[in-house]
Amino acid sequence: MKKPYRKISDYAIVGGLSALVMVSIVGCKSNADDKPKEQSSLSQSVQKGAFVILEEQKDKSYKVVEEYPSSRTHIIVRDLQGNERVLSNEEIQKLIKEEEAKIDNGTSKLVQPNNGGSNEGSGFGLGSAILGSAAGAILGSYIGNKLFNNPNYQQNAQRTYKSPQAYQRSQNSFSKSAPSASSMGGASKGQSGFFGSSRPTSSPAVSSGTRGFNS
């Protein structure tokens, strides 16, 4: 039986509003966690929900700094001054719709070739950062087929994370909540991003390299 306070130490790195929301999520999940549920893939755990923290960068772009499995999807935006706010469903859907239009006309950062990531304006906006995160696999699932086989998306999805460590923590966190995924052939090399693991027969995509990340 999992204790509702078991992972509080994991959230110590997250401050303010995000920490309070995380604690409430863990408490709400405790009853559900008492009932073991078999999961066949990483995508099943992602579909349950994701807690995502996006951090504003100096170039006004956004990066994923932390994300964990959750019973519901919450997206928190932290600005340069450290102020945090939870995006409303209306805001999220508006951002995703705007990003979908960019994907359709080829102007989304997610589907453009990686030009090195260090040029001015090369960062990701809120919409692309959301779709590159675990939350994007849930909230933007209806446009997943536009991204699934796009090689540029497979590379750029990792770049939406602030560091290789943030990406790896996310992959490990969602993998732990889908224990049966390890029995399905191991991690897939060459695919990254949560849309890349959405096939029922796919296993978690975990990259061992650090290429493509921007700090």
From Swiss-Prot:
The keyword Repeat does not apply. Residues 158-215 are annotated as: Disordered. InterPro entries: UPF0323. Keywords: Cell membrane, Lipoprotein, Membrane, Palmitate, Signal. PROSITE patterns: PROKAR_LIPOPROTEIN. Transmembrane segments: none annotated. This is UPF0323 lipoprotein HP_0232. The lineage of its organism: Bacteria, Pseudomonadati, Campylobacterota, Epsilonproteobacteria, Campylobacterales.
